[in-house]
Regions:
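Alpha-helical structural signal in soluble globular domains
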Residues: 42-50, 82, 115, 119, ...
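Active-site segments of SGNH/GDSL-like serine hydrolases
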Residues: 94-98, 114-150, 173-174
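Structural recognition of the beta-strand scaffold that forms the well-ordered cores
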Residues: 15-17, 23, 61-66, 90-94, ...
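Serine-esterase "nucleophile elbow" of acetyl-processing enzymes
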Residues: 1-65, 80-87
Length: 215
């Protein structure tokens, strides 16, 4: 049986950003949007600014449910308490970076992510699948990322859910390495990198969704 989430006008939209340290970010350093050092905080700012330009009454909140060092198995275990209890409309799922660091099989990682997508659908939450960003300094860990990302896109297509290519958004197109301009330490992103992810998610998914409610 196909589960098709129903999209309808709403006065408030809640999004949970679910993942590991790439979701946690560095910290929220202040009220200045230029200082946002996590993609969820910057994404919320972009959404509210966009709606303000349309004079829309819709309110958007992006709840950060990242856990540093988490694996996809851990994300699966805590999905109910960290995501379902929030009763969000959408959940952005970004996981697998740490699994690859522990040399886990990309197919196993994809299985865990698939179960998270299904758990969201079963709870009436729309999942947004994200590919894993690249790395700088350990080229041998780029191919498993590419394999995992192909599986992520395939699993998203099977479920007719959106997928966002954060690898392409932050990688050097010539080397497939994490772009130096977005890298903090080769694995984690700097402030510019987290803002890039927030902007990419907004431009490639959230903007069009908000426009439906701002009319």
């Amino acid at each position: 049986m196909t589960r098709s989430p129903i999209t309808k006008p709403i006065a408030a939209m809640k999004i949970v950003a679910f993942g590991d340290s790439l979701t946690v970010g560095e910290s929220e350093l202040g009220s200045d949007p230029e200082e946002y050092a996590s993609y969820p905080g910057y994404l919320e700012f972009l959404a509210q600014r966009h709606l303000g330009k349309h004079r829309s009454d819709v309110k958007v909140s992006v709840v950060n449910r990242g856990v540093c060092g988490d694996l996809t198995s851990g994300m699966l275990r805590r999905f109910s308490r960290d995501v379902v209890v929030e009763k969000p409309d959408y959940v952005i799922i970004l996981g697998g970076t740490n699994d690859i660091g522990w040399l886990m099989d990309p197919a196993m990682i994809a299985d865990n992510l698939s179960m998270i997508y299904d758990a969201a659908l079963d709870a009436g939450i729309v999942p947004i699948a994200c590919t894993v960003p690249s790395i700088l300094g350990l080229d041998e860990l780029i191919p498993p990322r590419s394999r995992l990302n192909r599986m992520i896109r395939t699993e998203a297509e099977k479920r007719s859910i959106a997928s966002l290519d954060l690898f392409a958004a932050t990688a050097d197109s010539e080397t497939n390495r994490l772009s130096e301009q977005y890298s903090a330490d080769g694995l984690h992103l700097n402030m510019k990198g987290y803002r890039q992810i927030g902007q990419y998610i907004f431009d490639n998914w959230l903007r069009a969704l908000l426009d439906k409610y701002a009319q």
